[in-house]
Structures are given as structure tokens and as C-alpha cells.
Amino acid sequence: MKLSRYIILAGFVCYLFAQKAQATPSPIVAELMREAVNVDTKNLSALIQETTKNNPTIRAAHDRWVAETHVIPQARSLPDPVLIASYFTLDGNKGEEKVLQGLELLGGSQEIPFPGKLYKRWKIAKINASKMDAEYLAVTISIISQLKRKYYDLYFVNKSIEILKHNQALLEILEHKANEKYGSHHAPEQDVFRAKTELARFEMRLVSLQQEQQSLITDINNIVNRDLDINITTPHTLPITPFEHKAEELNDGIKQRSPHLNVRRKNAEKAKESIALNKMAYFADFELEAEHVKDKAIGAVGYQVVLKATLPLYFFDKQNKAVRESVARYHADLEDFQDTYQELGYRVQNAFLIIHRTNKLIKLLESSLLPQAKEALTSSQVAYRTGGVDFLTMLNNLLTLQENEVELEGEIVKHEKQITEIEEVLGIFL
């Protein structure tokens, strides 16, 4: 019973240790998670925190990073020594000859790589672990960016539904007034038909938006890795993230911070060190063997020390080709680095231009178009009662106001999604 308790306790301790190891992010990812707390939208901030803990893609990237950190001490370790033990006997025909009638041998051997090889392997392992850390951050920020885009899309859909329902209620009032005027022969019947047609179109759009709403909720829950039916709320108004960064500052940020570019950089560094390691393959590795020998029959004791060395005899087909291979891989990694830098630069520049465009459009909509559209609808409602304008003019003013309201929310969402694009490239929250 005591033994079984000890086994259970040991297993529980191992489980806790494994859970703790799995739950501990790398320092750069931990810094990103601390920044996530400052995201303006609290519900979105909570979703980000939950995603970084539960998303299987992020957890897999974390485990790959942890695995590579355990490779580092292995890379600088000597190969395991070999224990040698033997007993040798020879049945001779001559009874008086006792030589080799009971020879015992005990010793060991140790393989010793050429000086500098273990250091190079250790350095390559460190670079690879650093690369996996950058990849861990890149995966994390990419998943978070995907989550934020879906969340902003959900906000836009929710806001569109809210605007449509408000205008639908207003249109129902206008339809009632058109019915009254038609009943008193002050308006044509086509005004009533047009109102009913627009109400039906409102219903069609609401059905489509509600389906899109549920799809987005499912997508977000899938990213967070939880029950797909959990409801997700969005704020009544989405805060607009201030953006005062310059293009030069963002380009410098790509070189200094981008985890995607850092992965390529580490690949090139690893390939460069691999060239040096492959060049060291021209130098011999050694094996030192020491043995204690005892002949029990005659009581003789002796020692044997053997030094072995590998000879790169076939260097033309092996070492030469290995060096050329590593050089080619290094050049390929440099090209990948440049290609990634160009792609990231394009993404940031494009997002930068769209952000400035959305800022101008948001100001134009808020300061000019929306107030004018509201004023036009209000004045047309008053004029319609007195017969100053027809129903179609008033309906057109309502639809124009609705279009401007939806467009404003759409520009706000585009602004936030392009901020997210830059965040994904730089690996930080702006």
C-alpha cells in the first residue's frame, strides 16, 4: 500500500511539473501577453488572454520551443563512454603451457570530437532554440491578429444589425404615415408598395447578417478553443486606436522586432554556423581507450592505452559536398530573408496608407456627411407631412443616412484591422 501511495504521489508531482512547464511562456511571449491587458476593448482583451492559453496552435509552438531548449545541453555533451569487459581463455594441447588460460580485460573508451566541434554544435542548438522562440511569438501574434479581425468583423455585423433595426422601425412609422395619406387620397398607392418593398429588403439583409453573426461567433470560439455556442458580445462603440507612427519608424521596427523576419534571420545564422561546422569535418575525431589486463593463470597484470583517430579519406565525396551544400543553403536562407523583408515592408506600407485614408474618411463622415444626412431626413419628414416632398425623396434620405452610418462603422473597422496588420508584422500591440 505504501509503495502504491508513493507511486501515485510521484505521478502527481510529475503531472504538476509538466503542467507548470507547459503553462510557462517564453519571455518575449510573456511580454506580449502583458501588453494584451492594455487593449482598449475589455472583452477582446479577455479573449486574447484565453486564446494565448488555450489555442492548440500556440501551445504546439510553445512545446516546440521548449523541446529546442532541451537540445542545447545535449549538443555540447560528449558522446557516452563505452565500458569494455571481457574474459579470454584458450584451451591449449600442452598441459605445461599456462599462457592465455584466463585473461581478464576491463576498461573503457571515450570518443572525443575535434576541439571546437562541440562548441559549434552548441551554438547551432542555441540559434535554433532562439529561432523557435521567434516562431512561437510569430504564431502567437498571428493567431491573436486572426482573432482580432474576426472580432472586428463581428462588431461591424452587430452594428449593422443595430442600424438596420433602428431604421426598420423608422420605416414602419413612415409606412404607416404613407397608408394614412393614401387613405385620405393625399398620396399615391405606390408609396405604400415602395415602403413595403423596402421593409422586405430590410428583412432579407437582417437574415443574412444574423447568419454571418453566428458564423463569426463560431469562428472566434474555434480560435479560442472552447464551446462553439458561447455567445460573444461587442461594445456599443468601438474605440479608435490613435495612430501617430511614421513610415520610417515602422520600417525600422520590421528590422528590429518582427518575429517573422527574425525567424528568417535565425535560419541564416544557423546556416552560417553550419558552414563552419562542416569545414571542421576535415579534422579528425579521436577515441581514447584504456584497459586493465590481468592473466589469472600466471598472475601477470598489465595496462593498455589506445588512441584512435578518424581519417577523412573520402573528403572529396563527403566533406567537400557537405560544405557546398551548407553554403547553398546559407545563400537560400539569405534570399528568403530578403523576400520576407520585402513582403513585410509591403504589408506595413499598405496598412499605413489605408489607416491614413480611413482617418480622413472617418472625420469626413462624422463632421459632414452624417450630420447633413440626418438633417436632410429630418427636414424631409417635416416637409412630407405638409406635402412639400414626396415619399420617395424621404425614403431616399433615410437610405442615404443608413448607408453613411454603416460606412462609418466600416471605416472604423478597416482602421482597426490595418492597425492589427501592422501589429502582426511587428509582433507588438500598438
Labelled PLM ranges:
Residues 25-41, 84-121, 233-244, 287-324:
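Small/polar, glycine/serine/threonine/aspartate-rich low-complexity segments that form flexible
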Residues 60-72, 139, 143-164, 173, ...:
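Amphipathic alpha-helical coiled-coil segments
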Residues 49-59, 66-81, 95, 106-123, ...:
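A glycine-/polar-enriched beta->alpha junction
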Residues 8-15:
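Bacterial N-terminal signal peptides
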Residues 2-3, 36, 136-255, 351-354, ...:
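Periplasmic alpha-helical coiled-coil/stalk elements that build and connect Gram-negative outer-membrane
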Residues 123-126, 189-197, 391-399:
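Short, charged, amphipathic alpha-helical segments
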